[in-house]
Amino acid sequence: MGVQGLVGEAVDRIGGEPISARMARKAPIKHLDPTLVVVTLLLSAFGILMVFTATANNESFLTRQLVYAFIGIVVLVGVGFVDYRHLKGLSPLIYSLTLVMLIAVLTPLGYVQKGASRWINLGSFQAQPSELAKIAVIITLAAFLAERKGEVNAAAVAVCMALVTVPGVLIYLEPDLGTMMVFVALTGALLLVGGAKIRHFMTLGVLGLVAIVVVLQAGLLQDYQIQRITAFLDPTPDVRSEGWNVAQATIAIASGGARGKGLRGENTQTSLQFVPEQHTDFIFTAVGEQLGFLGAATLLGLFALLIWRALRIAGMSRDLFGTLIATGIACLWAFQVFVNVGMTMGIMPITGIPLPFISYGGSSLLTNYVAVGLLLNVHMRRFL
């Protein structure tokens, strides 16, 4: 190396630290992931539009979803600028507060709708703690596994299962089978990346099968949950009740064709409101019917790009905690998209899992914005 190179290196390392690292520490915003931001905004706009059309152009739903999006963006910015590594020490507090909220739902503070107690009344709005619990589970498991630094034994796996089981039982009591399924997927993904062995997954698989048999034999599922499973297996005999949802959703998507019937299409499953809960659980049917195969494919393409960015950030993180957070978020989105879209197409049972950024609902949208904020946080601090 010449004299000029030696001088340059010395200048760059004034104070014992590369200038580039000091600049990154002072201005992490320079390392923002623009692709993730753009995809998030596109999905949000897509969702607001579909909520408006799926509710027969009801301005009340439109206004609320716009308010939720604005609040979500504010929260995203806040989450993005607080170093995510502080969350490791705060994970016990986050976990405890989540349990308190889940317990509150089961008390008189809870708001019951259609036989389920999943919400807490906040004036004219309702909060759904089970949605925010998804992020809490990711942070809690990520913090625990990161401390093990890839050395995961049977005892560590048991602790992870216990950490998930407690909120899982509370959510079962609401009841909310869909979120319980999400917890299972998150636990599996985080254990895999965190260092669990194949034998651990084999043991968990056997225990899972035993648990399913016990649940079915003991009659622990609600009648409507059993009906949804049977309707999924064969919707034809049950087409007047639970099978109606699947049948109408399939008709709506199939009738959209390649280009769809348009956002203002008349005499459609959407405009005639044949599909129940179309602005929430079944909103993908509105996408398929109004925008057709091309619109649905575009939406799924945006989801694929979103999940890819999350996985890329997981690979770029400088620590295991950041990798686990990003992996959990990627799994969260991938699982929810797969189940929700599969549910509307009749290849998955109806579970009430929302479509990220698209389904109507403040708690779901806020949860997804928090997830994006965490990803941006990990990405911006990958050099620190």
Where are these regions (language model features)?
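N-terminal membrane topogenic signal
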Residues: A24-T40
